[in-house]
UniProtKB/Swiss-Prot annotation:
This is Multidrug resistance operon repressor. It comes from Pseudomonas aeruginosa (strain ATCC 15692 / DSM 22644 / CIP 104116 / JCM 14847 / LMG 12228 / 1C / PRS 101 / PAO1). Disulfide bonds: none annotated. Changing residue 69 to A: In strain: PA48. Changing residue 70 to W: In strain: OCR1; leads to increased expression of mexAB-oprM.
Amino acid sequence: MNYPVNPDLMPALMAVFQHVRTRIQSELDCQRLDLTPPDVHVLKLIDEQRGLNLQDLGRQMCRDKALITRKIRELEGRNLVRRERNPSDQRSFQLFLTDEGLAIHQHAEAIMSRVHDELFAPLTPVEQATLVHLLDQCLAAQPLEDI
């Protein structure tokens, strides 16, 4: 069932997203990591899914292959990511973090965790669980190709 939407909902969500992105970027800059929040997400996906290919990375990030390819080249140039030929399909590459990439990723993840903790600390554990449930419910109602 669909209900009328509170007009304050979208501005509130956008304000939270903007606050989180700005705070994370500020912390990344202060630590001189020369990364953006999407860069951190790329490193996280590669770390969690060692051997991930460019197509799957692009799909998970909702970005086209050309943009992902440029980003991976940039991260390779900084010695954070390395590409290896896929042994089961020589036409594709698998992505891995370098040792330096892993160290930078862990540092950036600590920053992101701290920012998230500060943002959600005013909510009780039950309120946090309710928020997660409500957001999951909204996403579950969307067509698969939109998620």
